[in-house]
Amino acid sequence: YRPEEMLVICPSESGLTRGPVEIVKQARSLGIPCVCTVQSGGSPLERYCDVVIVKPSGKELALPSTKGYSVGLLVLLLCLLEGARVKGSVGQAEYGQINQSLASLGGSCQSIAGQTVKWFLRRQYPVMKPPFYRIIGYGANYGTAVEGALKMMESHKRMTAAYELEEFLH
């Protein structure tokens, strides 16, 4: 691929993490355009990106970034959808249908959040009792297990480890 055929996308909360900043610097030195999402303006990551999208999710009150992460994914999904529309990969009817589905997400998320809280309150003791947790993933979902373990540790401060299924069975 040529640089004009590539794009580096860096979803970020603070824009301070060294890895994404270094990746964007390297990409820019190769002439590859860069886009980032950040929680608020003025970060080092923004200085090296061609496009900066400030996420409208507001400040996170809890340590695990759930709201900002979800909004960042939605923003990137909208960017990809718009790119597909402009490129002609998505027809007008499909584009409208996807936008309509995305517009209903807010209400769905509130409903699911309420159901999740009720579920947790009914199971709070058995969920919080163990001193540690193991999250097991398989194949492409191993990354999901790793991210899930991180979010669990951030949320309840108990040791949580992620394992790949076949490795765990040894």
Locate each region found by the language model:
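Short, structured loop/turn "capping" segments at alpha-beta junctions
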Residues: G88-Q92, T116-F120, M159
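A short, well-structured juxtamembrane/interface segment
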Residues: A113-K129
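Structural signal for conserved beta-strand scaffold positions within catalytic alpha/beta enzyme cores
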Residues: C10, I53-V54, S111, A162-E164
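A ubiquitous structural signal for well-ordered alpha-helices
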Residues: I23, L105-S108, G148
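A generic local structural motif
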Residues: V21-E22, Q39-S40, W119-R122, F168-H170
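Glycine-rich phosphate-binding loops that contact phosphosugars or nucleotide phosphates
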Residues: Y1-G96, S101, Y138
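Long, charged amphipathic helices and adjacent flexible linkers at domain junctions
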Residues: I98-V117
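Anionic-ligand anchoring segments at beta-strand to alpha-helix junctions in alpha/beta enzyme folds, i.e.
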Residues: Y1-V8, L30, M128-H170
